[in-house]
């Protein structure tokens, strides 16, 4: 039986811990969830923006390479689309035991776990009897050089086996480790949307080389950010670790998060 949903996952920032020497303070992992029956709409959305911006037909849209005035119409289209977005925002300097996360892909795996939990809740709560498929999601990661997706499958398998011990909150009827694929953004248009979402939240939290953040992009996406009973934080936006909470509650640069995404 085929899946009901398709989930596209991409990231922004890096996993390094050399702050002040090139590593980003934040790492963002985002998912864009769409119904498989409407997946063609993601292709049309990207094609429409590409032609609006006068970009070559086959060239993938990379959010960071677009000018500010080109990013806005792209995000306006996403905000108006029939999809949902989930983002995990990791503040690396707040991690209590950074040495634990220097191990290869460890930080990435943690972010994948938190993202998978929220994606699975959305899919579980939005399945309907009319839907085609078995209620699960096909997960498409943006291909990262040097990473084997068998490793992610193995990691999710491990979480599934140890769900109770590790207090994993993934709904396994929605997320199935054997339904994971990795593609390059040029072959799956939804990945270009996931890149735009991850980059938007990254720019909202990560200061530029001149010390400024830009939160307009993240605010524009509010109509499609997953929420539960009006609550965004903990659902469509997961901040991690908890040690970053004080900073987010008090610093001026996170005002957008406190006001737009309560």
Please give the residue ranges for each predicted region.
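Phosphate-ester processing/binding pockets and catalytic centers
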Residues: 1-262
């Amino acid at each position: 039986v085929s899946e009901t949903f398709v989930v596209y996952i991409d990231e922004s920032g890096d996993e390094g811990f050399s702050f002040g020497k090139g590593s980003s303070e934040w790492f963002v992992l985002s998912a864009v969830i769409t119904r498989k029956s409407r997946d063609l709409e993601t292709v049309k959305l990207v094609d429409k923006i590409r032609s609006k911006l006068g970009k070559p037909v086959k060239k993938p849209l990379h959010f960071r390479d677009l000018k500010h005035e080109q990013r806005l119409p792209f995000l306006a289209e996403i905000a108006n689309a029939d999809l949902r977005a989930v983002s995990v925002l990791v503040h690396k300097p707040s991690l209590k035991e950074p040495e634990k996360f220097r191990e290869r892909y460890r930080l990435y795996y943690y972010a994948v776990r938190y993202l998978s939990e929220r994606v699975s809740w959305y899919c579980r709560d939005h399945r309907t009897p009319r839907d085609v498929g078995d209620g699960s999601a096909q997960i498409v990661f943006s291909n990262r050089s040097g990473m084997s997706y068998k490793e992610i499958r193995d990691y999710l398998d491990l979480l599934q086996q140890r769900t109770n011990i590790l207090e994993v909150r993934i709904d396994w009827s929605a997320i199935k480790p054997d339904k994971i694929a990795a593609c390059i953004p040029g072959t799956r248009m939804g990945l270009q949307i996931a890149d735009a979402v991850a980059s938007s939240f990254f720019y909202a939290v990560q200061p530029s080389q001149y010390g400024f953040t830009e939160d307009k992009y993240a605010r524009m996406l509010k109509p499609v950010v997953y929420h539960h009973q009006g609550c965004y934080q903990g659902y469509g936006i997961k901040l991690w670790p908890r040690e970053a909470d004080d900073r987010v509650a008090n610093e001026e640069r996170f005002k957008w998060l406190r006001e737009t995404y309560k």
